[in-house]
Structures are given as C-alpha cells and as structure tokens.
C-alpha cells in the first residue's frame, strides 16, 4: 500500500514538473509571437510611410509635368506669334526695300538732271551771256525769256554772232526774243475760251434755233409715220365715237328713268297691308270698278304688249329676246296672251288722305 502511495506521489510530482515546463514554454512562445508581431507591425508602418512618400513624390512629378506642359504651350504660342511678327517684318522690309529702290531711281534721275543743269550752267558761265531787259509801264514784264539759236554752230560762228545777240534798241521788236507764257496763264485763257464757247452754245438764239430744228424734224417724222389724210380720218372716227358714246349714255339715262317710274312706290305696299283689314269698302269699290272696268279693258286691248314700250331704245337682238316665247303644243293652237284686267278700289282714309289703288292682275 505504501509502495503504491509513493508511486502515485511520484507521478503527481512528475506531472507537476511537466505542467510547469509546458507553462514556461507557452510563455516563451507567446513572447516570441508578440515580438514578431511588433516587428511585422513596424515593417508594415515603414512600408506604408514609404508608399505615402512615393505617392507624394508621384503627385509632385505630375504637377511638375503639368507645369512643363503649360510652359511648352506658352512657348509654342509665343513662337507662333514671333513667327507671325517676323513674317510681317519681312513684308515690311520688302516694301521698304522696294520703296528704297524707287527712291534710288528717283535720286539717280535727279542726279542726272542736276548734272545736266550743271553742264548748262557751266556753258552759260563760259559764254557769259547775261542780258537785262527793261520794259516800260505800258508793257507787262515777261515771266521767262528764251533765245533762238543753233547748237550746231562752231565757236567761230558763236564769236561772230555775239554782236547779233546784243540787246535790241526797240523793245517792241520780237525778232530774237519772245515771251513764254506761264502754265497758269494758259490754263486761264483755255478756261475762259471754254466758258465763252459754252455761253455761246447755250445762248437764247442758239436755243431757239435748236428748238426750231427739233420741231421741223418732229413734224417730218410725223408726216412720214402718219399722213395728214389718215390723221383726218382718225379725228373724224374719234368724233363719231364720242357722239355714239353720248347717245348711249342718254339712252341709258332714259332707260333708268323709265325703270324708276315703272317701279311701285312704298305707299302702295303700305296701303295693300291696310286693305286686308278693311273688307267693308270692298263692295262699294267693286260697283265703281264695274262701271270703269269696261273702258279700261277696251283700251288695254288696243295697246300692244309691254315689250313694245321700249322698242326704240332696244336693239334688234334685244328686241327679239324681249318678245314672249311660249312652249309649242302638239295639235294645239298657240295661246295668245290675255289682256290685263284693271280694277279700281276705294282706299281707306289714312291720315286724312284719299287715293285709289290700281291693281294689275293677270287673269289665270
């Protein structure tokens, strides 16, 4: 029993030792894991910081690239502007060079002219032919003088001619000296001559002559186009047309007057409306009508149809159209128009006025 108890105790002690060893190992492992995790965290932090730095540098590089691009665009614009300005300068230099060439040509021409003048001056100085001409008050002082001479003369002839070209005694003689008029005087004279010619052309006499000539030409043209006989015929036909127009106008006025006279008046329509309510006077009116109706019917038979009233004013086709036309009946006689029956009826007193109503009725 004791042996078993000691063995159990030993086992317990061994187990306690093993548990202590495992606990120590677990603690060491946890410490190592913690240290490793700390290192890993520090490494991750360093990596993140480096990434942030790289991103910042990348942004800075992008900004720098953008600024470089903007500078390049500005440079290109400035380059294009400078190119345009240079082209303008080239054009201006070309124009200036052309102008300079023109100026050089003008200067050369002036130099040639100056040389000619100098040569002439030297010749004049050599000859020493200066003359002073004095005019009286009556004569106008000339603007310029010119001497008539031959340039092909030799020196000996010129020496002989010195006596000939002496100033003349008679100032009125123009044998060797003549006065050249200035340009302004010539222009004045030519202007005056033009004005005088215009005044002469537009004078009253010339205008009258031109009018007479034009009238003659127009009359000749008229006689060529239309002969006087034809003109007379045209005038006569115009007068006939006027007369026919006046006749037509008069006939139209007569026709209008006849229509206005034949139309019934407003009073007749009013009296017909009043007649319907007054039947008492019908009997008395019929008695009077019977006495007078016979004579009126007889007269109406003697009268022709109504279309013959205006036979004078209507033309032949209109007269034929105005005739009454009746439809043909087979096997029957053509009916003749019956005469108008006229009846007079006494009118009722309206506003103290008495009048007779004339009713025209076609017998049916």
From Swiss-Prot:
One of its GO terms (cellular component) is cytoplasm. PANTHER family: CAVEOLAE-ASSOCIATED PROTEIN 4, CAVIN. Residues 44-77, 202-226 form a coiled coil. The coiled coil domain (residues 44-77) is essential for membrane-targeting in cardiomyocytes. Keywords: Activator, Cell membrane, Coiled coil, Cytoplasm, Developmental protein, Differentiation, Membrane, Myogenesis, Phosphoprotein, Transcription, Transcription regulation. Residues 231-256 have a biased composition (Basic and acidic residues). Belongs to the CAVIN family. This is Caveolae-associated protein 4. Pfam families: PTRF_SDPR. The modification Phosphothreonine is found at residue 336. The modification Phosphoserine is found at residues 172-173, 355. Its main location: cytoplasm. The keyword Membrane applies. One of its GO terms (biological process) is cell differentiation. Disulfide bonds: none annotated. Residues 1-24, 231-283, 311-339 are annotated as: Disordered. The keyword Membrane applies. Modulates the morphology of formed caveolae in cardiomyocytes, but is not required for caveolar formation. Facilitates the recruitment of MAPK1/3 to caveolae within cardiomyocytes and regulates alpha-1 adrenergic receptor-induced hypertrophic responses in cardiomyocytes through MAPK1/3 activation. Contributes to proper membrane localization and stabilization of caveolin-3 (CAV3) in cardiomyocytes. Induces RHOA activation and activates NPPA transcription and myofibrillar organization through the Rho/ROCK signaling pathway. The modification Phosphotyrosine is found at residue 326. It is found in: Cytoplasm, Myofibril, Sarcomere; Cytoplasm; Cytoplasm, Cytosol; Cell membrane, Sarcolemma. Component of the CAVIN complex composed of CAVIN1, CAVIN2, CAVIN3 and CAVIN4. Interacts with CAVIN1, ADRA1A and ADRA1B. Interacts with CAVIN2; this augments the transactivation of NPPA. Interacts with CAV3. Interacts with MAPK1 and MAPK3.
């Amino acid at each position: 029993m004791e042996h078993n108890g000691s063995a159990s105790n030993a086992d317990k002690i061994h187990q306690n030792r093993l548990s202590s060893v495992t606990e120590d190992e677990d603690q060491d492992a946890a410490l190592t894991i913690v240290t490793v995790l700390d290192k890993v965290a520090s490494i991750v932090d360093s990596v993140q910081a480096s990434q942030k730095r790289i991103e910042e540098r990348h942004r800075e590089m992008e900004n720098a690239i953008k600024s470089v691009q903007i500078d390049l665009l500005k440079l290109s614009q400035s380059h294009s502007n400078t190119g345009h300005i240079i082209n303008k300068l080239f054009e201006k230099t070309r124009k200036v060079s052309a102008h300079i060439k023109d100026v050089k040509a003008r200067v050369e021409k002036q130099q040639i002219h100056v040389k000619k003048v100098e040569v002439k001056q030297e010749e004049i100085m050599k000859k020493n032919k200066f003359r002073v001409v004095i005019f009286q008050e009556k004569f106008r002082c000339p603007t310029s003088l010119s001497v008539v001479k031959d340039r092909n003369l030799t020196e000996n002839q010129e020496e002989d001619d010195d006596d000939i070209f002496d100033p003349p005694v008679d100032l009125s003689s123009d044998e060797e000296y003549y006065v050249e008029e200035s340009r302004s005087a010539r222009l004045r004279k030519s202007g005056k001559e033009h004005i005088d010619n215009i005044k002469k052309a537009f004078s009253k006499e010339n205008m009258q002559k031109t009018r007479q000539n034009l009238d003659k030409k127009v009359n000749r043209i008229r006689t060529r186009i239309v002969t006087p006989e034809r003109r007379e015929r045209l005038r006569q036909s115009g007068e006939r047309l006027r007369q026919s127009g006046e006749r037509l106008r008069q006939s139209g006025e007569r026709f209008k007057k006849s229509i206005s006279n034949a139309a019934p008046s407003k009073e007749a329509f009013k009296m017909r409306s009043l007649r319907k309510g007054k039947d008492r006077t019908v009997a008395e009116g019929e008695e009077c009508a019977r006495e007078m109706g016979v004579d009126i019917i007889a007269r109406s038979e003697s009268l022709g149809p109504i279309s013959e009233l205006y036979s004078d004013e209507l033309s032949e086709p209109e007269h034929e159209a105005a005739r009454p036309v009746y439809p043909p009946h087979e096997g029957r006689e053509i009916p003749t128009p019956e005469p108008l029956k006229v009846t007079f009826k006494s009118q009722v007193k309206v506003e103290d006025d008495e009048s007779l109503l004339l009713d025209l009725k076609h017998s049916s």
